[in-house]
From Swiss-Prot:
The lineage of its organism: Bacteria, Pseudomonadati, Bdellovibrionota, Bdellovibrionia, Bdellovibrionales. Gene3D superfamilies: 3.40.1280.10. Its main location: cytoplasm. It comes from Bdellovibrio bacteriovorus (strain ATCC 15356 / DSM 50701 / NCIMB 9529 / HD100). Its EC number is 2.1.1.177. SUPFAM superfamilies: alpha/beta knot. This is Ribosomal RNA large subunit methyltransferase H.
Amino acid sequence: MKFILYNLATAKEPWADEVSELYKKKISFFIPFDIQSLKAKKSAREDADFKRNEESELILKNINSDDYVVLFDERGSVLDSIQFSKKVENILGSSKKRAIFIIGGAFGVNEEVRKRADLKVALSPMVMNHLMAQAMSLEQIYRAFTIIKKIPYHNI
């Protein structure tokens, strides 16, 4: 199995790149892992629906029918780290070849992506930018593996 994180972030910050590389390396210790930035065409901020649909189509084009899809979405289930680790463990026990983790664009994703997601997880009831969402999702994926493997990291 391979885990892939798709994002639509357009902003670049040195700290976010460092965090992403750090957690990519840590997660790759447990499973083949990659972070892929999907690039949608630029459009005006006023075209929120157009941009959401265009980015959602791009996401769907990069998902195979047999992938397990996890969508990080503010409307998803609120899980604690133990609950999330159990979901990751179930994914690992499935017959899927890839697990795709998705962080939507600035305007979120459309209903088609939500329907395609096998699991929808809220990182927080608060809204955050993509760089923060990516940092939090990477840390939680890593934390899930340390819980599953009983590696001292999660201290609750």
